[in-house]
């Protein structure tokens, strides 16, 4: 029914948490699980070789002079999927019990629509100006921990159980993964545009194309995940809590590519979801 997919780059300690939580906390915990590890030099490849049987992983250890990045890695994984649904995740996520079933239940409520369904998320305040927004709750670092070695998973599971039982509403918004989508609909839209590799602006480009193709975006409160906060792209711990040079360069370059492709800046609605291009 579902294939879990993660594309990762030098994010081993968080990848370990993500993989373990998917196999331990998912309702569909025995589903296929694809890992795309690109240009990793931090021991990720070795860990996957040692643990792929333990976690029943289909691993692809990729080396590319021109990186695919997260978006391209999602495309890579999706091409390997043979199930009806794809469940994309980032390597800096921790998923809570039955997070995937809640997304599938939401998907099943709208059987005749093309959907992108995301989990509600909680993340530590890794940037001074970080604030909660629709679909994302920002908490102080000490609330649940902020790093792989101080994360309070048991406490967060208790919080998640309370949050998901007391809240039941949907936000009409798309977020970066975790995202549940039918494989046929991913193929129809063509996945992420390689123009924006290796990172940045690709989510907005994908969502805008989805909007133009009649997709509906749903972010329910019944599925909750922990997001360590841009560890897979910004490389905070390697750069004294500053975004990596690769990320900053990609953000600048891809902003120029965005304007070349779309001809104007994005326009957002009250949920901070892209709704079009400024004319």
Named regions from a protein language model:
Residues 94-147:
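Conserved donor NDP-sugar-binding/catalytic core segment of glycosyltransferases
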Residues 125, 131, 207-279:
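Active-site-adjacent helix/loop segment of glycosyltransferases
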Residues 37-46:
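A conserved acidic beta->alpha catalytic loop
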Residues 86:
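Short aromatic/hydrophobic "clamp" motif used to bind/position activated sugar donors
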Residues 145-183:
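A recurrent flexible, glycine/aromatic-enriched loop bordering the glycosyltransferase active site
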Residues 103, 172-190, 195-224:
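A short, conserved alpha-helix in the catalytic core of glycosyltransferases
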Residues 20-30:
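Short, acidic, metal-binding catalytic loop of nucleotide-sugar glycosyltransferases
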Residues 64-81:
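Glycine-rich, basic loop-to-helix element that forms the pyrophosphate-binding segment
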């Amino acid at each position: 029914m579902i294939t879990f997919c993660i594309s990762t780059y030098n994010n081993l300690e968080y990848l370990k948490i993500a993989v373990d939580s998917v196999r331990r906390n998912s309702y569909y915990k025995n589903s296929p699980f694809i890992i795309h590890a690109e240009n990793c030099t931090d021991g990720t490849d070795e860990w996957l070789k040692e643990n792929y049987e333990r976690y029943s992983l289909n691993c692809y250890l990729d080396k590319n002079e021109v990186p695919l990045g997260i978006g391209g890695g999602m495309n890579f994984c999706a091409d390997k999927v043979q199930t009806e649904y794809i469940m994309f995740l980032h390597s800096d996520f921790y998923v809570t019990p039955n997070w995937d079933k809640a997304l599938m239940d939401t998907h099943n409520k709208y059987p005749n629509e093309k959907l992108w369904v995301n989990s509600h998320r909680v993340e530590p305040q890794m940037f001074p100006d970080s604030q909660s927004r629709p679909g994302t709750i920002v908490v102080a670092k000490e609330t649940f921990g902020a790093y792989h070695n101080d994360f309070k998973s048991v406490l967060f599971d208790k919080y998640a159980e309370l949050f998901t039982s007391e809240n039941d509403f949907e936000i009409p918004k798309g977020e970066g993964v975790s995202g549940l989508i039918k494989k046929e609909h991913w193929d129809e839209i063509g996945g992420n545009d390689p123009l924006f590799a290796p990172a940045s602006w690709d989510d907005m480009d994908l969502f805008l194309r989805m909007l133009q193709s009649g997709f509906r975006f749903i972010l329910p409160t019944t599925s909750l995940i922990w997001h360590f906060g841009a560890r897979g792209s910004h490389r905070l711990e390697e750069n004294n809590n500053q975004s990596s040079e690769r990320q900053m360069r990609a953000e600048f370059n891809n902003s120029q590519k965005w304007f070349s492709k779309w001809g104007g800046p994005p326009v957002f609605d009250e949920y901070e979801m892209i709704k079009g291009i400024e004319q």
